[in-house]
Amino acid sequence: MWWPYLVLALLSGLEASGFPRSPLRLLGKRSLPEGVVDGVEVYSTKISCKVTSRFAHNVVTTRAVNRADQAKEVSFDVELPKTAFITNFTLTIDGVTYPGNIKEKEVAQKQYDKAVSQGKTAGLVKASGRKLEKFTVSVNVAAGSKVTFELTYEELLKRHKGKYEMYLKVQPKQLVRHFEIDAHIFEPQGISMLDAEASFITNDLLGSALTKSFSGKKGHVSFKPSLDQQRSCPTCTDSLLNGDFTIVYDVNRESPGNVQVVNGYFVHFFAPQGLPVVPKNIVFVIDISGSMAGRKIQQTRVALLKILDDMKQDDYLNFILFSTGVTTWKDSLVQATPANLEEARTFVRSISDQGMTNINDGLLRGIRMLTDAREQHTVPERSTSIIIMLTDGDANTGESRPEKIQENVRKAIEGRFPLYNLGFGNNLNYNFLETMALENHGVARRIYEDSDANLQLQGFYEEVANPLLTNVEVEYPENAILDLTKNSYPHFYDGSETAVAGRLADSDMNNFKADVKGHGALNDLTFTEEVDMKEMDAALKEQGYIFGNYIERLWAYLTIEQLLEKRKNAHGEEKENLTAQALELSLKYHFVTPLTPMVVTKPEDNEDQTSIADKPGEDAPYAATSTAYLTSHQSPPTPYYYVDGDPHFIIQVPGKNDTICFNIDEKPGTVLRLIQDPVTGITVTGQIIGDKGSSPYSRTGKTYFGKLGITHAWMDFRIEVTTEKIILGTEDELSTFSWLDTVTITQTGLFVAINRKKNMVVSFGDGVNFVIVLHQVWKKHPLHQDFLGFYVVDSHRMSARTHGLLGQFFRPFDFEVSDVRPGSDPAKPDATMVVKNHQLTVTRGSQRDYRKDASVGTKVTCWFVHNNGEGLIDGVHTDYIVPSLF
């Protein structure tokens, strides 16, 4: 049972190509703010956790600034639970956002292969220890520039030993001016307890930095240490924030079950309390081959002795040891009486290593022993059987073919009881152990070779030590529920919880009934939950302040998780179908899974660098870095096209290392078609505004774009951007945001990020990326008013049929400039340009690129084409006038 676990670290280093600065140059330098390490200041780190009904939505945001006088590489590291799905990542440099795009693995694989062939690979996500996988991305940041990293991931919190636990392992590695962990919890059942603690700080110091509270359905935890509280000593400049921050809570349970319904999706939680424990019949099948010698066998003995101390007198048990052959403690199961337990301890203390690894015969002997006990009625009728195997290697004697061992075990068990496989260390075929466990209603777990391996073994036993119900079935009215997640379980263990989710066939349903049936220690039990939809709506109204579609996403999370699990031991057409279902949902709900990596494009030295974040499997050794398809490669420079200012159209021509620009002089209110692609269905239009008080009939004076329209015909999606607000969605369902918002919106094939008062990014999958810049002027300015700039950052997925004032230039074209001569302005020479079979007189000038700085911009020199771009654009500029934005 994995718990939410997150490690945060931010590192900085010298640019690879830079030389160490002379110490003499540092003398007399101005002092840098505290928290600056190697020229980079991490001035803000916030971990925002929003939990609604066990479903956690976590956002990790780190902001840094390069205070050095040269470029620096800044890295962002987050360790997150292996069971979590990354849902979003954005990298923002000087106000320009670069989003991550989630895509099918086959597409990303091509980029991986290309990078490998070029010798350029670097992992974004890789396995990292027992419960974690590490997300890492780095970027070169120019002197004086700021960078923001934001990672979002989601996970269903599992109940373990009677509580939900969220671990945040914090490692900023330097003092951070604004460091905060902020967790909001909403539980419709009501919160019964909430606590938080940190392993890296004393309770006295923690108390002043930590606030925690809960009342009714809401809980809140905030940890905001000051700079002084972060210091490892009163005069130190290094941070003591290095350890676990733990949030623990549980909920009220007036009844064993709880059903919640939102927007046609439901989740059904089930966790009965106070039931007597079902006696268990347990066989431990232990590998004692030569590879278990030393600490492994010693730790195994310690763990088994502790397990014997926890056995209940109603339980039955036996030990089977396998090496080259098979040895049993007793010929059959025996009751856990005090005398038998003492004899068992003597046997365990005598266990020693020898021989090879005969997994097949060891397992079959244990299965036969449990089967015989049930058939011969030597164990209680109302009891449950469990087999636990521990091995540290692969079968190498007897039957050693993994597929044949799986077949033998499957036929022997016949679904009667679960098999739990524990893999000790890394030198084994974990996929084999996991597949065999899953197809026999169990799970596999890796036991890590460490000083606490015995505690890991004990911990697993404690999870299965107290079954309260067996053969659990969750039932709903026939034809009322669609797309149901797993609803049958061989056992329900004390302190845990089952979660079943699905979709209502009729969203107008007034009520429905949910039954949970299972075999208890004394009798068969049925737990019924009556769901009244009106009462449900009233009870859940408060949850809107967290996030409203949480049950639908929870359902998607569970469904994908279970499809991927089934896929592990499926074959042929069944595996193809499971893969297709999981892939479709992963793309729809924007989850990074083993089928859907995330591609992150970031700027590196005027080139785009593409990195791929894949999700590694448990079979990957956690120290390895080459087990996942995680790549980084350099792609050719991307040409840019934009319109900003008066309005100035700027076209950077690939292969020419030069830029062309032109103006369109039209009266305010005119709408121009900027881009139209009939293949992708993407259209962009812009409406012209003038200075304050300008006449709608006048073409004189400065004009700008005050409104932009973006549509995607095939997605039935549109965006209207003004200097005041952003309206987006389908024609029937529109959402409105202001430029005061900071918002990220994702759905399949779409990413939108609004950066407060700066810009917004619009991406249609990988290969179509626009940036809209907001220019704000003094509100009381007598002449000028706010306006917009439109930038095409990436267009390589647009088709060859794309047209429009900007779109026509996405296709390759050439031009030649000659006869450079003095112009009417000595600072702006004239020249002759030959382009598209036209000979034009052009003037050298400069415009501004405002993507990184909307107030000052970056100077761009260009050849200016006069007369509304005549001779450069296809046709005349009036051909591009359209009646409206949409």
Swiss-Prot record:
Glycans are attached at N88, N577. GO terms for molecular function: serine-type endopeptidase inhibitor activity. Its main location: secreted. Residues 1-18 form the signal peptide. Gene3D superfamilies: von Willebrand factor, type A domain (3.40.50.410). GO terms for biological process: hyaluronan metabolic process. Residues 26-155 form the VIT domain. I-alpha-I plasma protease inhibitors are assembled from one or two heavy chains (HC) and one light chain, bikunin. Pre-alpha-inhibitor (P-alpha-I) is composed of ITIH3/HC3 and bikunin. Belongs to the ITIH family. This is Inter-alpha-trypsin inhibitor heavy chain H3. The lineage of its organism: Eukaryota, Metazoa, Chordata, Craniata, Vertebrata.
